Amino acid sequence: LMIIGEGEEVNNEVLALFRQAQQAGWSKTRFLETAAKIQGVLIPSFYVPHWNPDGTLHDLTPTHGAPARVTKRIIQDLDACYYPTDPIVPSTEIVHDRVNVELFRGCIRGCRFCQAGYVYRPVRPRKPETIIRQGIESLKNTGYQEATLLSLSSSDYRPLDEVCDGLLEYCEPRSMSLALPSLRADNFSMDIMSRLQKVRKGGLTFAPEAGTQRLRDAINKNVREEDLLHSCQVAFEGGWNGVKLYFMLGLPTETDEDVLGIAELANQVLHTWRMHATNKARGVRITVSTSCFVPKPHSPFQWETQVTMDEYKRKVQLLRESIRAKSVTYNWHDPDTSFVEAVLSRGDRRIADVIEEVWRRA
């Protein structure tokens, strides 16, 4: 049984049906046949695949009364649906060791590499009072000292000032920090930054994605170099001394000039710090991180090729040799993971054994 779309509502419907089936002693087949009538529920075993001579899928024949097409579930009112404000807190340190609160779902942008920006349409914001309540309740229940406001592009949330003020009113007396990931360099403001610096400063992260304007235009990122440098200037003038920059290697039409442009952009950020930082005694930390482009289904780049592992490693080495400033740290993602991700994301039901093998190999 698989659920297509967003699960907050349909999860409860399936679980309620499962409890009913257990209490009534239904067979597995009867349970699945009934579940298939719920919008968003896909029963793969109820569809017989037919293949083209080249191995691609021709069509699926539904059986057991299953619908010919499964319609994904979309939450229309995020304020009314369940949100876990008392999640299980792990007993060991984890990567995202903080409270996460969703600002809105979807994205007003249209980056051509981004699957999430297309599959989570339309854009649906939460009300400011809902976000503030969920954030405060989560902090109280978990004991975490940091809250992150999540979305595909946090600074595109219009009432962001109101949310920051409401959460900081609770966080500031308790020395808790508030983070805004996924900031866009073209709408980062001093007003937002002044709210964040009321408590201890977290890191600032920008994702230019590509090193040159030509390539950023090609992927529809729509962030200009002057926007990024101005945002960094605002941050450095406000007392920040650390910036993380995220890029992708292997994007369609990418050349070595684009790769070298990443190093040049990092140098420009460093120069901006030297010119505008208010506290140079602490130094500056500029972190450049790259990942390997993965062509994702349901994105405009879904049919693009992925660079070979050797080519990705060559690009990484080229960039490593180009970053010479001691204040700039370069991190890159393991290409093996990106290639597995590409295979799994573009596969069909025949990839099931591969998924199991990947899981067994951790």
Please report, for each region that a protein language model flagged, where it lies by residue.
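Conserved structural-core and active-site-/substrate-pathway-adjacent residues in large, well-folded domains
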Residues: M2, V41, C81, G106-C107, ...
